[in-house]
């Protein structure tokens, strides 16, 4: 009986310590990690679609870059979130799923235009999110992650601005 009580107490202490660990992550940092994970899932999913549906070679190549780069970003944010005890979503947000569906309905050069427009606006928001974390985040590790991936978002924004010009999506 005492052994069972001791085991139950230990399990409860472990559960509470992991809960306290997750709750000790400031709201801004937690939101940034969750938003970054959703964004990475979105980019990977949309990039895979662009790899197959892209009309131009440039749109398909941009899709490949998104899958490659945002897969690395996803692994980094997952590792950081795990170390901080933050539970991340396993896919894009509901709004992002809607954007994927709407963009995917286009075909040919219309797909390329819709994809370029979507990604230009998305990467502008990614840069703003990274800037916000760098400015407002409390924990050093999420701030460093934001700083690291801000450069990638800027490169991606340049890719999609060029694609938008090529496919007359401006």
Indicate residue ranges for each PLM-predicted region.
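His/Met- and acidic-residue-enriched segments that coordinate or traffic transition-metal cofactors
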Residues: 2-8, 17-170
């Amino acid at each position: 009986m005492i052994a069972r009580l001791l085991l139950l107490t230990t399990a409860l202490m472990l559960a509470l310590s992991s809960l306290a660990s997750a709750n000790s992550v400031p709201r801004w940092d937690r939101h940034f990690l969750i938003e970054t994970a959703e964004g990475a899932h979105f980019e990977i999913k949309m990039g895979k679609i662009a790899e197959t549906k892209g009309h131009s070679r440039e749109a398909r190549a941009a899709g490949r870059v998104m899958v490659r780069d945002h897969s690395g970003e996803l692994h980094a944010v997952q590792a950081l979130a795990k170390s901080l005890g933050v539970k991340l979503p396993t896919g894009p947000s509901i709004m992002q799923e809607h954007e994927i569906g709407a963009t995917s309905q286009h075909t040919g050069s219309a797909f390329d235009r819709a994809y370029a427009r979507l990604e230009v606006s998305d990467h502008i928001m990614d840069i703003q999110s990274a800037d916000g974390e760098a400015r407002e985040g409390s924990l050093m590790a999420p701030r460093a992650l934001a700083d690291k991936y801000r450069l990638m978002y800027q490169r991606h924004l340049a890719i999609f601005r060029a694609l938008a010009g090529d496919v007359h999506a401006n």
